[in-house]
């Protein structure tokens, strides 16, 4: 996969760029980033090490801002086997490296 999504919708790309630049995601006038700071439920943050859509630092920063005491940060990919945004869903190894840890995270909290 490529490091970014090819031919993204310009409006979506602009929203993501604004979110990354301002470090705040605002949707329909609601500052989602501020609301997440009071989020208490378990958090699983998954990102690819070469994600060009939501860079790892951005994903990690928002997870770090959340109030939950039950946080799992799952960075996928290595220098020799990088993961971009789309790789998280359809990349080689996604089943084992992404979906199995997600299932485990959910299963341990639903018991």
Q: Could you tell me what each predicted segment is?
A:
Residues 1-23:
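Hydrolase active-site cap/lid region
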Residues 1-4, 29-32, 86-93:
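Active-site rim elements
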Residues 7, 11, 57, 97:
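Conserved active-site and cofactor/substrate-binding residues in soluble primary-metabolism enzymes
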Residues 17-35:
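Active-site nucleophile elbow and catalytic-triad environment of alpha/beta-hydrolase enzymes
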Residues 32, 41, 55-65:
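Short alpha-helix in the alpha/beta-hydrolase fold that links the catalytic acid
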Residues 39, 45-47, 51:
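Short beta-strand/loop motif that positions the catalytic acidic residue
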Residues 69-111:
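Catalytic active-site module of serine/aspartate enzymes centered on a nucleophile-bearing elbow/loop
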